[in-house]
Curated annotation (Swiss-Prot):
MF GO annotations: alpha-tubulin binding; dynein heavy chain binding
Keyword Transferase: no
Keyword list, A-Z: Cell projection, Cytoplasm, Cytoskeleton, Dynein, Leucine-rich repeat, Microtubule, Motor protein, Repeat
InterPro entries: Leu-rich_rpt, Leu-rich_rpt_4, LRR_dom_sf
Species for this entry: Danio rerio
Annotated GO CC locations: cell projection; cytoplasm; dynein complex; microtubule
LRR repeats: 49-70, 71-92, 94-115, 116-137
Domain LRRCT: 150-192
Note: Outer (ODAs) and inner (IDAs) dynein arms contain the molecular motors that generate the force to move cilia by ATP-dependent reactions. There are two mechanosensory systems that monitor and respond to the mechanical state (curvature) of the axoneme. One system involves the central pair microtubule complex and radial spokes and the second system involves the outer dynein arms.
Protein name: Dynein axonemal light chain 1
Stated family: Belongs to the dynein light chain LC1-type family.
Keyword GTP-binding: no
Gene3D superfamilies registered for this protein in UniProt: Ribonuclease Inhibitor
Length: 192
């Protein structure tokens, strides 16, 4: 099997392709590397001006080495093999969007550090319990959540009450699974 691509190699390729210097760039796309990236190594710390980083469609297992990315607002890690959210604390003060769908995340420990997170796309992961889902209530800015394809969502959607149950637990959401959240208090008063 081919050796994994390192972040350093991927950045060299990206610089050649775009003609930009990685340490000056505000948006860096390292998605779908062949062979795939397996580790978020220390080379990431050179991306001091990066606001949008895409590492999706690789084989990354752990979030790491984000400490130099003082301006990071959008992090895309979809379609990897990430099992937990450890490592995000380095960007907890700046990150506004985390795209982490199609991974292996079961527990949301560590999400509470994301004080500015507005958008969380984490469909098709392995979250099974309300106890984990409730950790999202620690995110004061979260307004847009995609959670479809997690065992918890699938179970409650099958019963027809996912949206109601999820929005009851996260009342500040404006969008859930791509749909605007409609508050239902007014509608239920006239029903018997």
């Amino acid at each position: 099997m081919a050796k994994a691509t390192t972040i350093k190699e991927a950045l060299v390729k990206w610089e050649e392709k775009t003609g930009e210097k990685a340490n000056d760039a505000t948006a860096v796309k390292l998605y779908g590397q062949i062979p795939p990236i397996e580790k978020m190594d220390a080379s990431l710390s050179n991306l001091v001006n990066c606001e949008r980083l895409s590492l999706s469609t690789n084989c990354i297992e752990k979030i790491a080495n984000l400490n130099g990315l003082k301006n990071l607002k959008i992090l895309s890690l979809g379609r990897n093999n990430i099992k937990n959210l450890n490592g995000l604390e380095a960007v907890g003060d700046t990150l506004e969007e985390l795209w982490i769908s199609y991974n292996l995340i079961e527990k949301l420990k560590g999400i509470h550090v994301m004080k500015k997170l507005k958008v969380l796309y984490m469909s098709n992961n392995l979250v099974k319990e309300w106890g984990e889902f409730l950790k999202l209530a620690d995110l004061p800015s979260l307004v847009d959540l995609v959670f479809v394809g997690n065992p918890l969502e699938e179970k409650y959607s099958a019963d027809g009450n996912w949206i109601e149950e999820a929005t009851k637990r996260l009342p500040k959401l404006k969008k859930l699974d791509g749909n605007p959240v409609i508050k239902q208090e007014e509608e239920t008063e006239g029903e018997s």
